[in-house]
From Swiss-Prot:
Meso-2,6-diaminopimelate binds at residues 398, 421-424, 473, 477. One of its GO terms (cellular component) is cytoplasm. HAMAP family: MurE. Carboxylation is probably crucial for Mg(2+) binding and, consequently, for the gamma-phosphate positioning of ATP. Belongs to the MurCDEF family. MurE subfamily. This is UDP-N-acetylmuramoyl-L-alanyl-D-glutamate--2,6-diaminopimelate ligase. Pfam families: Mur_ligase, Mur_ligase_C, Mur_ligase_M. The gene is murE. It comes from Janthinobacterium sp. (strain Marseille) (Minibacterium massiliensis). Its cofactor is Mg(2+).
Amino acid sequence: MSILTTTALASILDWLAANAPKAELASDSRRIAQGDVFVAYPGDEADGRSYIANAIERGAQAVIYEAAGCTWDAEWDVAHLAIDDLKEHAGEIAAAYYAHPDRSMFTVAITGTNGKTSCAQWLGSALSRLGQPTAVIGTLGVGIFTNGGHGSFDVTGYTTPDAVLLQRSLVNVSNLGATALAIEASSIGLHQGRLSGMHFDMALFTNFTRDHLDYHGDMAAYEEAKAMLFDWPGLQHAVINLDDAMGVRLVQRLQSRQADVGITGYTLSDKKIDGIAVLRATDIRSNQSGTVFQLESSAGNTQVKTQLVGQFNVSNVLGIIGILLAKGIALQDAVNAVEALTAVPGRMQQLGGGEAPLVVIDYAHTPDALEKTLATLRSVANDRGGELWCVFGCGGDRDPGKRPQMGKVSMAADHIVVTTDNPRNEEPANIIGDIVAGITAPKNAPQIIEDRASAILWAGRHAARQDVILLAGKGHEAYQEVKGRKLPFLDADHAALALSTRVMQGAS
């Protein structure tokens, strides 16, 4: 990815200062306010240049736009500047325009197929408990943690926001007092340059499994996109999961290319790599309420008692501890901070239990994530003396090749209910057919219930009180995307309804 020359960047900034002094930048015409500058370039789903007229109607006083393939309309009577490869350079331009707001913050980027959201939220909570108000930007939106808690999050609709919105968000959180930042760095966001213009003090890698092949094409391209984070200029330290093969490759890449970057590895096994610090979790014991493990590190050994369920969350917690220790936080202070962490909304979120089935809502939407989540909940179901249910679907217009893999993985459950996720522009029946093709030897015949609300209600009605029901795939999402519309839908609401219906019907 090319970088603008200093002269070219200065010229653009001078033009903005002359034509739109003190204006805000916006790349979404719907966010334009009177006096703003509209930044227009082709996006994933639409070409921003198609909305120039709309942006001007909403009050844009100037427009900068991608030059290639666009002829300025004489009726658009505002200042305008054509820029080559604008999408690629939007991050650099916006960062410089807003005077690099991230430079005053301790900044950590988190990448990996699964675990980004939990790790970003937990890092924000942990750092804020240690006295550093921390902004978090990711799948749940943009928010700030103080003293371990947070207010509402402003939803952006992306794991990693577009470059212009990202820089505006950084200005806002900086003005609100954030002195640290935890940001989810998606492979697509990295590949598209949404993070261009930022600095990262540290980077955290969680894991690498199949996802987004509809965008990247193959696993090699997907891996290379994620690896871009670890080539970042100025990176000081990398914290890497050694139990993942890509993690080992990243360590080797860093050692050969960027010897000045510090490395901390973490593992649930006995893995070792020369030349790096290693955090290790042993004697892991988990139940419905949380997990206890022994932490071995060069900073000392100690017991850690978390309120989180599952070995994959032990791995994520090790990643958080790795960042804290690399920052210079004392071991016991780091442990105290992670012991206070609780489940992120839509990530192993629990409802019911006791005299009702335990319903667990999780964003697991890849074969690997679903497999690990079911393995964790199998032990919980065994502890409760019950069976395990899996209610899930797959997203439309996204990597159809993973659907039968998801079906195959779901056979780890005793009862499978296949339903919709976000069908988008595909027919739900076709998506479900792809999933069911992978369910070759289920313990019980899978139930096919296309309507997700009905599927959740059905599982809640038929499960025994000691059973565990996993609602997988949508997690925190408050909508279901169908034919271009986002219809209100929250798994937690429908789970609560299913549980209350059991009470009214006197189910056992």
